[in-house]
Protein backbone atom coordinates (compact mmCIF):
# COMPACT_ATOMS: atom_id res chain seq x y z
CA UNK A 1 0.00 0.00 0.00
CA UNK A 2 1.39 3.42 -1.00
CA UNK A 3 2.20 5.97 1.66
CA UNK A 4 -0.29 8.85 1.92
CA UNK A 5 0.39 11.75 -0.39
CA UNK A 6 -1.41 14.12 1.97
CA UNK A 7 -2.46 13.60 5.57
CA UNK A 8 -4.02 15.73 8.30
CA UNK A 9 -4.25 15.03 12.00
CA UNK A 10 -6.67 16.90 14.28
CA UNK A 11 -6.74 19.83 11.84
CA UNK A 12 -9.00 22.56 13.16
CA UNK A 13 -9.83 25.73 11.25
CA UNK A 14 -11.41 28.76 12.88
CA UNK A 15 -12.75 32.04 11.54
CA UNK A 16 -12.64 34.27 14.63
CA UNK A 17 -14.79 32.38 17.17
CA UNK A 18 -16.48 30.16 14.60
CA UNK A 19 -15.15 26.63 14.05
CA UNK A 20 -15.14 25.80 10.34
CA UNK A 21 -13.52 22.36 10.53
CA UNK A 22 -13.08 20.53 13.82
CA UNK A 23 -10.38 17.89 14.26
CA UNK A 24 -10.05 16.72 10.65
CA UNK A 25 -8.22 13.42 10.23
CA UNK A 26 -7.79 12.87 6.51
CA UNK A 27 -5.61 10.49 4.50
CA UNK A 28 -5.29 11.01 0.74
CA UNK A 29 -3.47 8.18 -1.03
CA UNK A 30 -2.05 8.08 -4.56
CA UNK A 31 -4.69 7.17 -7.12
CA UNK A 32 -7.52 8.91 -5.28
CA UNK A 33 -9.66 11.77 -6.60
CA UNK A 34 -11.42 13.61 -3.77
CA UNK A 35 -14.37 15.97 -3.98
CA UNK A 36 -14.63 18.61 -1.26
CA UNK A 37 -18.30 19.51 -0.77
CA UNK A 38 -20.33 21.59 1.63
CA UNK A 39 -22.55 24.67 1.86
CA UNK A 40 -21.38 28.22 1.19
CA UNK A 41 -19.16 29.48 3.98
CA UNK A 42 -18.37 26.00 5.28
CA UNK A 43 -14.62 26.54 4.89
CA UNK A 44 -13.82 24.76 1.62
CA UNK A 45 -11.59 27.54 0.25
CA UNK A 46 -9.95 28.04 3.64
CA UNK A 47 -9.25 24.31 3.92
CA UNK A 48 -7.75 24.05 0.43
CA UNK A 49 -5.50 27.03 1.12
CA UNK A 50 -4.39 25.47 4.39
CA UNK A 51 -3.63 22.12 2.74
CA UNK A 52 -1.60 24.00 0.12
CA UNK A 53 0.49 25.68 2.82
CA UNK A 54 -0.83 29.22 2.32
CA UNK A 55 -1.36 29.71 6.05
CA UNK A 56 0.63 28.35 8.98
CA UNK A 57 -0.67 25.41 10.98
CA UNK A 58 0.13 26.31 14.57
CA UNK A 59 -0.95 24.54 17.75
CA UNK A 60 -0.95 27.92 19.51
CA UNK A 61 -2.32 30.31 16.86
CA UNK A 62 -2.71 34.04 17.60
CA UNK A 63 -5.90 34.61 19.57
CA UNK A 64 -7.24 37.47 17.48
CA UNK A 65 -6.24 36.32 13.99
CA UNK A 66 -9.19 36.29 11.57
CA UNK A 67 -8.35 32.76 10.34
CA UNK A 68 -6.37 30.18 12.29
CA UNK A 69 -5.33 26.58 11.73
CA UNK A 70 -4.12 24.12 14.35
CA UNK A 71 -3.19 20.45 14.16
CA UNK A 72 -0.90 18.85 11.60
CA UNK A 73 -0.70 18.65 7.80
CA UNK A 74 1.87 16.53 5.97
CA UNK A 75 2.61 16.14 2.27
CA UNK A 76 4.68 13.14 1.31
CA UNK A 77 5.19 12.40 5.00
CA UNK A 78 6.78 15.79 5.67
CA UNK A 79 5.11 18.55 7.70
CA UNK A 80 4.20 21.60 5.64
CA UNK A 81 6.49 23.84 7.67
CA UNK A 82 9.47 21.65 6.73
CA UNK A 83 9.01 22.18 2.99
CA UNK A 84 10.98 24.85 1.19
CA UNK A 85 8.62 26.85 -1.06
CA UNK A 86 10.52 25.96 -4.24
CA UNK A 87 10.39 22.25 -3.41
CA UNK A 88 6.74 22.34 -2.35
CA UNK A 89 5.82 23.96 -5.67
CA UNK A 90 7.05 20.80 -7.42
CA UNK A 91 4.83 18.58 -5.26
CA UNK A 92 1.51 20.39 -5.00
CA UNK A 93 -0.33 22.91 -7.17
CA UNK A 94 -3.31 25.05 -6.18
CA UNK A 95 -5.93 26.45 -8.56
CA UNK A 96 -7.75 29.31 -6.82
CA UNK A 97 -11.47 29.87 -7.17
CA UNK A 98 -11.08 33.32 -8.73
CA UNK A 99 -8.40 34.87 -10.90
CA UNK A 100 -8.15 38.61 -11.49
CA UNK A 101 -6.06 39.73 -14.44
CA UNK A 102 -4.53 43.09 -13.56
CA UNK A 103 -3.01 43.43 -17.02
CA UNK A 104 -3.09 41.71 -20.38
CA UNK A 105 -1.10 38.55 -21.08
CA UNK A 106 -1.41 35.76 -23.58
CA UNK A 107 -2.89 32.43 -22.57
CA UNK A 108 0.50 30.83 -23.16
CA UNK A 109 2.22 33.34 -20.86
CA UNK A 110 -0.31 32.64 -18.10
CA UNK A 111 0.15 28.88 -18.42
CA UNK A 112 3.93 29.29 -18.44
CA UNK A 113 3.59 30.81 -14.96
CA UNK A 114 2.76 27.28 -13.83
CA UNK A 115 6.26 26.27 -14.86
CA UNK A 116 7.91 28.65 -12.38
CA UNK A 117 9.37 25.88 -10.15
CA UNK A 118 11.36 24.55 -13.09
CA UNK A 119 12.64 27.72 -14.75
CA UNK A 120 16.37 27.87 -15.34
CA UNK A 121 18.04 30.55 -13.24
CA UNK A 122 20.38 32.78 -15.19
CA UNK A 123 22.33 35.92 -14.48
CA UNK A 124 19.35 38.11 -15.35
CA UNK A 125 16.63 35.99 -13.78
CA UNK A 126 14.63 32.89 -14.67
CA UNK A 127 13.84 31.99 -18.26
CA UNK A 128 11.57 29.46 -19.93
CA UNK A 129 13.18 26.65 -21.87
CA UNK A 130 11.80 24.97 -24.96
CA UNK A 131 10.67 22.14 -22.67
CA UNK A 132 8.68 24.61 -20.55
CA UNK A 133 6.95 26.02 -23.63
CA UNK A 134 6.20 22.49 -24.85
CA UNK A 135 4.72 21.57 -21.44
CA UNK A 136 2.55 24.69 -21.49
CA UNK A 137 1.30 23.98 -25.01
CA UNK A 138 0.53 20.39 -24.03
CA UNK A 139 -1.48 21.64 -21.05
CA UNK A 140 -3.45 24.04 -23.27
CA UNK A 141 -4.21 21.14 -25.60
CA UNK A 142 -5.40 19.04 -22.66
CA UNK A 143 -8.12 21.62 -21.93
CA UNK A 144 -8.98 22.15 -25.61
CA UNK A 145 -7.33 25.56 -25.95
CA UNK A 146 -4.35 24.79 -28.16
CA UNK A 147 -5.56 27.44 -30.62
CA UNK A 148 -5.76 30.11 -27.89
CA UNK A 149 -2.06 30.37 -27.02
CA UNK A 150 -1.71 33.90 -28.40
CA UNK A 151 -5.08 35.18 -27.14
CA UNK A 152 -5.07 37.92 -24.51
CA UNK A 153 -6.69 36.41 -21.41
CA UNK A 154 -8.64 39.63 -20.79
CA UNK A 155 -10.60 38.89 -23.99
CA UNK A 156 -11.63 35.36 -22.97
CA UNK A 157 -15.00 34.28 -21.64
CA UNK A 158 -15.25 33.22 -18.01
CA UNK A 159 -15.22 29.56 -18.96
CA UNK A 160 -12.27 29.94 -21.31
CA UNK A 161 -10.33 31.82 -18.65
CA UNK A 162 -11.06 29.07 -16.13
CA UNK A 163 -9.71 26.47 -18.55
CA UNK A 164 -6.52 28.52 -18.90
CA UNK A 165 -6.17 28.41 -15.10
CA UNK A 166 -6.64 24.65 -15.18
CA UNK A 167 -3.98 24.38 -17.88
CA UNK A 168 -1.55 26.36 -15.71
CA UNK A 169 -2.06 23.88 -12.86
CA UNK A 170 -1.57 20.92 -15.19
CA UNK A 171 1.59 22.50 -16.59
CA UNK A 172 3.01 22.71 -13.07
CA UNK A 173 3.24 18.90 -13.24
CA UNK A 174 2.84 18.14 -9.54
CA UNK A 175 1.55 14.86 -8.10
CA UNK A 176 -0.95 16.63 -5.80
CA UNK A 177 -3.54 18.94 -7.34
CA UNK A 178 -5.75 21.15 -5.15
CA UNK A 179 -8.50 22.92 -7.08
CA UNK A 180 -11.12 25.35 -5.78
CA UNK A 181 -14.29 24.99 -7.88
CA UNK A 182 -12.39 24.25 -11.11
CA UNK A 183 -15.55 23.70 -13.20
CA UNK A 184 -17.86 26.40 -11.82
CA UNK A 185 -17.82 28.52 -15.01
CA UNK A 186 -17.77 25.67 -17.52
CA UNK A 187 -20.62 24.34 -19.64
CA UNK A 188 -21.54 20.70 -19.20
CA UNK A 189 -19.29 19.05 -21.76
CA UNK A 190 -16.28 21.09 -20.62
CA UNK A 191 -17.09 20.19 -17.01
CA UNK A 192 -17.02 16.52 -17.95
CA UNK A 193 -13.82 16.94 -19.99
CA UNK A 194 -12.11 18.71 -17.07
CA UNK A 195 -13.17 16.17 -14.47
CA UNK A 196 -12.13 13.29 -16.72
CA UNK A 197 -8.73 14.96 -17.10
CA UNK A 198 -8.40 15.31 -13.31
CA UNK A 199 -9.41 11.69 -12.89
CA UNK A 200 -6.70 10.58 -15.30
CA UNK A 201 -4.17 12.64 -13.37
CA UNK A 202 -5.17 10.90 -10.14
CA UNK A 203 -4.81 7.52 -11.82
CA UNK A 204 -1.20 8.24 -12.78
CA UNK A 205 1.64 7.07 -10.56
CA UNK A 206 1.88 8.69 -7.12
CA UNK A 207 -0.73 11.36 -7.89
CA UNK A 208 -3.96 12.54 -6.23
CA UNK A 209 -6.55 15.28 -6.71
CA UNK A 210 -8.75 17.26 -4.33
CA UNK A 211 -11.33 19.55 -5.95
CA UNK A 212 -14.25 21.48 -4.50
CA UNK A 213 -17.56 21.29 -6.34
CA UNK A 214 -21.20 22.22 -5.75
CA UNK A 215 -22.60 19.72 -8.25
CA UNK A 216 -23.03 16.64 -6.10
CA UNK A 217 -23.97 14.42 -9.03
CA UNK A 218 -20.84 15.28 -11.00
CA UNK A 219 -18.84 14.63 -7.85
CA UNK A 220 -20.50 11.23 -7.36
CA UNK A 221 -19.68 10.34 -10.96
CA UNK A 222 -16.04 11.40 -11.17
CA UNK A 223 -14.59 11.38 -7.64
CA UNK A 224 -13.44 8.25 -5.85
CA UNK A 225 -13.76 9.82 -2.39
CA UNK A 226 -15.48 12.78 -0.78
CA UNK A 227 -14.94 15.10 2.17
CA UNK A 228 -18.24 16.67 3.21
CA UNK A 229 -18.28 19.73 5.49
CA UNK A 230 -21.48 20.76 7.25
CA UNK A 231 -20.57 24.39 8.00
CA UNK A 232 -20.70 23.83 11.74
CA UNK A 233 -17.31 22.18 12.19
CA UNK A 234 -18.53 18.69 11.40
CA UNK A 235 -17.17 16.59 8.55
CA UNK A 236 -17.39 13.16 6.95
CA UNK A 237 -14.77 11.52 4.74
CA UNK A 238 -14.68 8.28 2.77
CA UNK A 239 -15.75 6.63 -0.50
CA UNK A 240 -17.81 9.08 -2.52
CA UNK A 241 -21.05 7.05 -2.68
CA UNK A 242 -20.96 6.50 1.08
CA UNK A 243 -20.37 10.17 1.93
CA UNK A 244 -22.44 11.98 -0.69
CA UNK A 245 -25.59 10.09 0.26
CA UNK A 246 -29.03 11.65 0.44
CA UNK A 247 -28.97 11.44 4.23
CA UNK A 248 -25.55 13.01 4.75
CA UNK A 249 -26.03 15.73 2.12
CA UNK A 250 -29.47 16.63 3.45
CA UNK A 251 -27.91 17.15 6.87
CA UNK A 252 -24.96 19.16 5.56
CA UNK A 253 -26.93 21.43 3.23
CA UNK A 254 -29.99 21.83 5.41
CA UNK A 255 -32.42 20.78 2.69
CA UNK A 256 -33.95 17.34 2.08
CA UNK A 257 -32.52 15.42 -0.87
CA UNK A 258 -33.49 12.06 -2.25
CA UNK A 259 -31.62 9.55 -4.38
CA UNK A 260 -33.26 8.38 -7.59
CA UNK A 261 -32.07 5.44 -9.68
CA UNK A 262 -32.35 4.57 -13.35
CA UNK A 263 -30.63 1.26 -13.94
CA UNK A 264 -27.01 1.72 -12.94
CA UNK A 265 -27.33 5.52 -12.85
CA UNK A 266 -28.09 7.48 -9.68
CA UNK A 267 -28.82 11.15 -9.00
CA UNK A 268 -29.44 13.28 -5.95
CA UNK A 269 -32.43 15.58 -6.39
CA UNK A 270 -34.08 18.08 -4.03
CA UNK A 271 -37.23 16.80 -2.41
CA UNK A 272 -40.41 18.76 -3.15
CA UNK A 273 -41.40 21.34 -0.58
CA UNK A 274 -44.53 20.32 1.29
How would you describe each model-predicted region?
Residues 52:
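Helix-to-loop junction immediately C-terminal to a conserved catalytic motif
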Residues 37-39:
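The feature captures the beta-strand-to-loop junction immediately N-terminal to the Walker
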Residues 177-181:
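Catalytic Walker B motif of ABC-type/P-loop ATPase nucleotide-binding domains
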Residues 112, 127-148:
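Conserved ABC ATPase "signature" region
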Residues 152-156, 160:
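Conserved ABC ATPase signature
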Amino acid sequence: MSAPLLQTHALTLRAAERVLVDGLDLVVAPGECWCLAGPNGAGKTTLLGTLAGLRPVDDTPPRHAPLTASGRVTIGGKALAQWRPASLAKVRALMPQQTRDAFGASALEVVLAGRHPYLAQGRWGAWESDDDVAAAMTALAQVGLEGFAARDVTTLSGGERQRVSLAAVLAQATPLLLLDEPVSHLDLHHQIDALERLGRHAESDDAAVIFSCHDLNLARRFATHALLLDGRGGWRAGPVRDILSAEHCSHAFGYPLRLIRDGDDEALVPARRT
